[in-house]
Amino acid sequence: ZPIDLMGKVFVFDKELSPBI
């Protein structure tokens, strides 16, 4: 499920970089 993975990565990236 690439979509689920993308969503997880997006959330993870947002949590890591709250500046963006």
Curated annotation (Swiss-Prot):
Major location category of this protein: secreted
Keywords: Amyloid, Lectin, Secreted
Molecular functions (GO terms): carbohydrate binding
Statement: the UniProt record of this protein carries the keyword Secreted: yes
Protein location: Secreted
One GO CC term on file: extracellular region
Limits of the Pentraxin (PTX) domain: 1-20
Homology family: Belongs to the pentraxin family.
Assembly and oligomerization: Homopentamer. Pentraxin (or pentaxin) have a discoid arrangement of 5 non-covalently bound subunits.
Name of this chain's protein: Serum amyloid P-component
Organism: Pleuronectes platessa
Lineage: Eukaryota, Metazoa, Chordata, Craniata, Vertebrata
